[in-house]
Structures are given as structure tokens and as C-alpha cells.
Amino acid sequence: MSTIKKVVLAYSGGLDTSVILKWLQETYDCEVVTFTADIGQGEEVAPARAKAETLGVKEIYIEDLREEFCRDYVFPMFRANTLYEGEYLLGTSIARPLIAKRLAEIASATGADAVAHGATGKGNDQVRFELGVYALQPDIQVIAPWREWDLTSREKLLAYAETHGIPVEGKRGGRSPYSMDANLLHISYEGGPLEDPWFEPEESMWRWTTSPEASADQAAYLELDYRCGDIVAINGEVLSPAKVLESLNQLGSKHGIGRLDLVENRYVGMKSRGCYETPAGTIMLKAHRALESLTLDREVTHLKDELMPRYANLIYNGYWWSPERSLLQQLIDGSQVTVNGTVRLKLYKGNVVVVGRRSETDSLFAPEIATFEDDAGAYNQQDAEGFIKLNALRLRIEALKKQTH
């Protein structure tokens, strides 16, 4: 422990990380540098500075990373139509690589020996943070207090805070029963009553979205303009990546879009039940697939669909900074050169309905061939006979073999 002189702590300013800050000072007798990231969690991050100063911190980093988060992490992920286990839009997972990157960079800039985080020893985030940091700063040490200390309950954390004069807003008995995580892409809920997979959460749990039943009775139409697989404008208004998510979150929430309740397989081996609200991401996934259906070659589309689960697993498990994720990203990004155009959507009571798609430059839809009417010889239907016979050849050989036995 004595070899660690300076630690960079991923610091939210909440109870857990404030206790960790003091615990690091006492346990390691080290200087602590705090890093607080604004990735759109909807909380004021400025109070983290005052609290860190109260606890004697001299080097404090508070950074607005919303645009970088959306531009360099969320948008590239959506180019792949990424879903983990067919449902989860990876809202928590995709935020961790950026935080790990800044932890490693700040450690290097400040001469820190170690980084620390507040992830528990039972979850995926400890893996994501640490794999990311090691990939970028291979000689760094990592301190994970939840794997070391005996403060195993909120009551113990509160008692520690009171004993050490740590300012705490939430007192005993006055908090949500859920463990929550939020950023511009989503908000998640775990723990508490949700640990019973049969339990239906109360309507009051959902903080972002109106229930589909109570959502607007009038459908909303919108048009999303894409360039190289990324949304660049909504209803003709050019927006930055972060503004795209903010706008779609507002629209989707109003129309009851983006709720998800699932049991997922954690990388650390257990099953976990979580509820998520991802209005913007739900809209983005539907729209992106619609435009790809118009502009991507069939085999390219199918290859992307085959690779997507592997890509999703890499993000979920914490391998964003791995060479294999980078290689897949190059392939995915290369496929997006032709994903240019506009998608028209209807939002209504929890549904995202594609009602139109067009691309003036890259559409592979050939109406003169696909038409049910007279195609003026553009497609010779007689050619289909040979195509079918050749593709049926192996099936016929197999059937004949069975008949002779």
C-alpha cells in the first residue's frame, strides 16, 4: 500500500464515491485526484467539486463529455445495430470506455500510481473499467474498494460518512429502492424489488418515459437525415450527436417509447434483472436498420447481422479498447459509406413505425425490376428456372439417396 502515492478516483460526488475518497486517504495515506464526467446523467456535477474540496482534494477534474460520448461511442455502436442478447441497447456498457480512457489519461498527466472506481465486486462495471484502463495504461494499478473493505451495506456507508464528517444528502430510509445509472443514452434500474423477476415495477419507477397507455393520443411524425450511417439532422434541423440524443429522448419519452424489462447474463457469471428506458436509442435502431435495408447489399447486411452479436458481446464485456473490437469497427464503418438518406417515422403509444425511407444517392431499390406490373423486360422470369434447379440440385441428390436406402 505504501507504494501508492497518488490515485485518480472516478468520482460522482454521491455517497459511495465520497466514502471511497476518504477511505483511500485513510487506507493508503495517498493523495486523491477526482475525476467527474458529465455524460448526460441529468445531475448537476458542479457540487462534486465542493464536496471534493471539503475532503481535501487539490486536483479536481470535472469534464463535459456529452458530445464526445455520443460522437465517438454511441454513434459508432449504432452503426452496427447493436443489441446484447437481442434486446439490450448497452446504455451502461458503452459509457464505460470513455470514463476508463479519461481515468488513464488523467493518471498519466498527474503522475498517479493508481486509479480507483466505485463498481462493486459482483457486477460488470468493475470488469469494464479495469479492462479499459489496463488496455490504455498497462502498468497502472487499480484499486476497487468494494472488493477490499467491510462496508457492505448502505447503513455502514452512512455510518462511516457520519463518523468522518462526509457531507451526505440522502439520509437513512430516504432513497429510491433501486440502483440507477443514467447518461444521454439511457437510464437503468436494478436491485430492490426487481431482484424478484416476477415483480412488475410500479409506474412511479420509470423516470423518463410516459407509459404507452398514458402517452400522447396524437402520433408524431419525424424525419431523420443520415450521412455515412449517422444521424445529422432531425426534421431538417442539423444537430450535433448529443443534441440528436436529447431531441429524440424528448420525443420518444412523450410517446412511451423505449421501456425494457429483461434478465441478462452478466459477464461475471450470474443472471441479473434490469429495467431500462432508452427512447432515443430505440428510435435510432429502428431508423438505421430501415435505411440500411435500402442502401446496403444483401450479403453485406447479412454479414453485419452475423457479426453484430460478437460486437455487442465485446462492448458488454468491456473490450471496447481491444484489437478485435477495433477491427470489427473498421469493417462496420466501411459498410456505412453508402448509408445516406432520410427515414420517416411515426411515433405512437410505445411504437416506432417506419413509414418511409429514401436515398437519392445510394438506394439499391430498383422499382423497374421489383414492380408487380409490366417491367418492360427488365427482369426475365424465365431465368429463375435455371437458378432454382441449380440450387435444388443438392436437395434432390439427398432425396434420391434416401429413396434408394
UniProtKB/Swiss-Prot annotation:
Sites where the protein binds L-aspartate: T120, N124, D125
Main location class: cytoplasm
Reaction equations catalysed: L-citrulline + L-aspartate + ATP = 2-(N(omega)-L-arginino)succinate + AMP + diphosphate + H(+)
Binding site for ATP: A10, Y11, S12, G13, G14, L15, D16, T17, S18, A37, G118
Any GO MF annotation of the entry: argininosuccinate synthase activity
Subcellular location: Cytoplasm
Any Pfam family: Arginosuc_syn_C
InterPro entries found in the cross-reference section: Arginosuc_syn_C, Arginosuc_syn_N, Arginosuc_synth, Arginosuc_synth_CS, Arginosuc_synth_type_1_subfam, AS_cat/multimer_dom_body, Rossmann-like_a/b/a_fold
Record's keyword annotation contains ATP-binding: yes
GO biological process, one term: argininosuccinate metabolic process
Amino-acid biosynthesis keyword on record: yes
E.C. designation(s): 6.3.4.5
First-tier enzyme category under EC: ligase
One cellular-component annotation, GO: cytoplasm
Pathway membership: Amino-acid biosynthesis; L-arginine biosynthesis; L-arginine from L-ornithine and carbamoyl phosphate: step 2/3
Record PROSITE patterns: ARGININOSUCCIN_SYN_1, ARGININOSUCCIN_SYN_2
Entry keyword set: Amino-acid biosynthesis, Arginine biosynthesis, ATP-binding, Cytoplasm, Ligase, Nucleotide-binding
Family, per entry: Belongs to the argininosuccinate synthase family. Type 1 subfamily.
Subunit relationships: Homotetramer.
The protein's name: Argininosuccinate synthase
Taxon lineage: Bacteria, Pseudomonadati, Pseudomonadota, Gammaproteobacteria, Chromatiales
Name of the gene this protein is made from: argG
